[in-house]
Amino acid sequence: MTSIYHILDRVPAIYKQDMEIEYEHLAMQLIKSGKLRIDTDDCCNFARFTEPALNISLMVSQEELTSPHLIPETTKLFQNLYKNSASDQKIKSIFDNLKKQIQKLQPVKKEVTEMLARIFVQSAHPIVIRWLLLNKTEVFLTYSHNIGDMMDMVSWQRVGGNSGMQSTNGKDVAIFVSCGGNPFAENNKDHPTYGNGFAAAARLQIIAAQELGHFADIKRDDKGRQITRHSANFSGTKATDKVRIARKNDIIHCHNLLSKLLKAGMKKQLDYETKLKFYNANKVSGLKVYAIKFMIFIYKFQLLNYSSRNNLIFVRKFKTDEYMALMIDAMFKDMQANLSPAADVYKNKNPEIEEAIACIEALARVPQQTVKWGYLTTKETMHDLYKIYYNEVIPSLITSYNAITGENYQRDFKKPKSNFFSKINIFSNKKLVLKPVREL
């Protein structure tokens, strides 16, 4: 079982006029905060600062070095690193050296920065992004396939091969996301499921959703202090009973649900679609192919009828897929892979610790699966974990956010008002349209 990284339930908005007002505000706040670090292979908006004698290694964005409202905070950061022993001249020298580094780099275009920020913030519930901003959390986005290019050597040796980074180390929280390509380039015609184009945009959202899921999993008190996780204890050695039981229930439920669909005719549909896909790939035509298409039509009708009778509404979301049964089967395998992550990094000799790691991962992947397959499908297949994430994790973030800010947060779904011409895309400044890829 392997995870899928190129499919999204919805195409993310990349222009202001298409964004929900709340998400657009958060995207612009993220940019303004100076905490968004971007590496697009040929462009970069941050510099690396190292001080081997003090074992210091960090990255500073161009905004943190040049924006008047951020310079005092950046100055204070360096003063704290040197425990207030650095002279004004030393701090000025650090600023000058970092600025010189950035001047040698190709700057990231404003439009690209904004589009990346928009895709990123749409990967999570807005309250998660609000906490990200409140905590002044660093966000690293790279076009590379892994996060190693953005890290210092010590960190790279530890986790540089990852596509993202678990953001629950307590003190120095950071979100790392790899796109595996340029999200705004044309889709690759030979291999559209990975590399540049929509595959990279999807990978950005999917990995960001998981990393932000880890970030959301952190429990905070009314003063904003991190106290534990919803999924396990802070050391990750023992799962909470609620998440442990929910994960086990979802594994069983997912298996049983797939078995029911297979018995309802999807098994035959799978067999016929597998043959049709082979024939299509090899450009085979004729009566045999028409006969297979007819049988697929019969079993597809049967499956949709069964799903309607049994209130399995999510099945209808797959009816427009070229190979409906193959896509549903891939979805179930993807769900099972995320409920029971099998990579070596999740293994442990102690079964209790291994279970805790699996629970931490599974809960964090609820928003990832929601971004990927949609809320109807995720709610049905990861039923118990979905309830915990959206009925407990998100509300707890809202409660603690309100307590620390004095606000009364309410989710806002409003979009900016659009006129007739913007609706039909005349006189619009849109230059790029993300073309979704939904194939296996």
Swiss-Prot record:
InterPro entries: Uncharacterised_RC0048. It holds the Pfam family DUF2748. This is Uncharacterized protein RC0048. It comes from Rickettsia conorii (strain ATCC VR-613 / Malish 7).
